[in-house]
Structures are given as structure tokens and as C-alpha cells.
Amino acid sequence: MSKQQAKKSSNNGRVVIIGVVVAIVVALIVAVLAGGDSSDDDTSSGDVAQNQPVLVDGAMLERLPDDGSDPAVGMAAPALTGASFDGSPMAVTPGDGKPYMLVFLAHWCPHCNAEVPRLIEWKESGAVPADLIVIGVSTGVASDRPNYPPSQWVVDKGWPWPVMADSVNMDAAAAYGLSGYPFFTIVGADGNVKVRVSGEVEVDALNEIVSEALAS
């Protein structure tokens, strides 16, 4: 082989190698962009989503008024079908013979942050009725506000009960007539709303509220 042919062959080899390297780099860039382009802006990392779809079955409750009687008391509570932050199925099925207490919380809300320790104290005191199903509902999620993401916030706060992640549109909160945070709704074993409360509640007051609600 002449020197000219050897040089030409060597140049061709370099061109092929460079072409392969460029193709690999392009493929990696495309893969990274594809992995980062998601229409679901509710996820923070991995398989954990800060919002989950919520299906509401039943009439939506009126918003809790600031004062006066609550128009929702005695009405059938809507059923909720949704999921936890990790996608595990969850459901609130009023009328199944079990009483529920739903606690709607927002990670950024100072009143919620003050209330969670009280609820933990309430549980640790042994005052929670054995048949009462307590479910937290994480709603009002905002990535630009304190304590985001809520999936980590509930862990850091030591929340001891299951948590349903509300939808981006806050379907669960709207269905129960949320008017502020934290927001409590107690549903009797008959499936009807017994009481709704908005704002912080001390442990002694909570005991009284729950006892009266479940006795009605």
C-alpha cells in the first residue's frame, strides 16, 4: 500500500470514529431531553407525585360559611377515589358503615403546621375513637411556597395517618366545601356530614367536636 493510500485509509477511519462519537452524543442529548420533558408537572422526583387525579362521586357540598349554620350538616358526603403520593389507591366511601374524619392540609399554611403536632398529640393520647378513619388530604400544592414538596413535608412533620393527594384543580377540597386551612370534615357511619370546622383546633376542643359528631 502506498503512503498516500495509507494516509487516505487513516483519514477515513478518523471520520468514521468521529461520526460514531457525534451520533452517541446526539443520542444522549435526545434521551436527556425526552426524559425531562413531561406534561405532568405535578411530580417532583421518581414515582412520587404531589398531585393525583381525584374522582368525586356525589353532590358537592356548599362552601362552609364564615358564620351561621352549616348547610352541609346532614347531607350525604361525596365519595372520593384517588391515590397517595406514591400512587397507591385510596378511597373515601361514606355510607360504608364507618365514620371518617378528613383533614385538609396545605404544606405552606402556618395554621396547618401548627395543627399537625396537636393531631399527633391527640393520636398518641389514645383519644382517637377506634372505629374512626382519619385521612389527611394534601391540597393547595404550590411549588414556590414553603415546605414543598408536601410528600416530604408530611414525613418531616410525622403525620401518622394515610394521606390522599388532591388533584391540581383541588377536586377533593372543592367537593367538601373547603373554606380555609386546616379544614376538618367528620362523616358519620351513615355517610352524612356531621360537622365541618375550618382553622386550628386545640386537642380538648377536638375531643369534644369528635365525640358530639359521632354521637349525632
Outline where the language-model segments fall.
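A short beta-strand-turn-helix
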Residues: 69-74, 79-100, 124
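Short active-site neighborhood of thiol/selenol oxidoreductases, capturing the structured segment around
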Residues: 90-113, 119
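Conserved helix-turn-beta segment immediately C-terminal to the redox Cys motif
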Residues: 98-99, 114-138, 203, 212
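Short, internal strand/loop/helix patches
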Residues: 149-189
